[in-house]
Amino acid sequence: MKGATNLFKSMRKPTNVGNFRQFSVNQVNSDNKRSEPGKKTHFGFTDVDEAEKEQKVHHVFANVAKKYDLMNDAMSMGVHRLWKDYYVGGLQVPYNAKCLDMAGGTGDIAFRILRHSPTAKVTVSDINQPMLDVGKKRAEKERDIQPSRAEWVCANAEQMPFESNTYDLFTMSFGIRNCTHPEKVVREAFRVLKPGGQLAILEFSEVNSALKPIYDAYSFNVIPVLGEILASDRASYQYLVESIRKFPNQDEFARIIREEGFSNVRYENLTFGVCSIHKGMKPRK
């Protein structure tokens, strides 16, 4: 185990399940008017209208929700658990903190935060109701976590239905690349955080060039096949692989975070850049 831990470190660089609120996707779309008619964006490697992308992404995660955690284990050979443990272990969570975990549907990050910080409360938010349903069912089995410490909210990350200056910590794990406008998500995170609040985003990123041929071969030839075998859905996992390649690289995403007002912006690569942890702070007034 010690050897495995050292290897991981060497691969990184500098029944009631709580409250539940729902904001329909249509209502959020109407209120936000984020997508401009006819304006193009990408859905994987395919160009689509912005509004169409949102619906396609929603369809992907509705399809994979029940097999989502199983597929994460299969695709990463369990390494995603190490990434998430390390990510949460490095969070600075104040006493009695209010945390917002966006795109947190199945609860993977929220449950870790609640164990890591016994006084914290977490709002788990996701645009996809089936993902939240899976998370709430998981919460029923988490006997060491008080249901009142978790709130489940169906909402869109590009216009969050939360008051400004509310949260001490904003987390988002493997979700922001699926958003049509990542910069708007970061902007909303800045808004809902208290002054001095922390942003921490875990996302797939640009892998080290030496590993790229092997990584690409595995991603394009193995992951879609696993999706077909384990989840009966090859297309959704083909999109997953493609979406990673379309997301900004580490430096570009750090620039977005900085431009939206965050200070002390930095990132840390895990597993040769397969994923990265991005952090920033909302300046104190």
Swiss-Prot record:
Assembly and binders: Component of a multi-subunit COQ enzyme complex.
Family the UniProt entry places it in: Belongs to the class I-like SAM-binding methyltransferase superfamily. MenG/UbiE family.
Transit peptide: 1-30
Membrane topology: Peripheral membrane protein
InterPro entries documented for this protein: SAM-dependent_MTases_sf (IPR029063), UbiE/COQ5_MeTrFase (IPR004033), UbiE/COQ5_MeTrFase_CS (IPR023576)
One CC-aspect GO term: extrinsic component of mitochondrial inner membrane
Lineage of source species: Eukaryota, Metazoa, Ecdysozoa, Nematoda, Chromadorea
Taxonomic source organism: Caenorhabditis elegans
UniProt-recorded name of the protein: 2-methoxy-6-polyprenyl-1,4-benzoquinol methylase, mitochondrial
Pathway the protein takes part in: Cofactor biosynthesis; ubiquinone biosynthesis
HAMAP family the UniProt entry points to: MenG_UbiE_methyltr
One of the Pfam families matching this protein, by short name: Ubie_methyltran
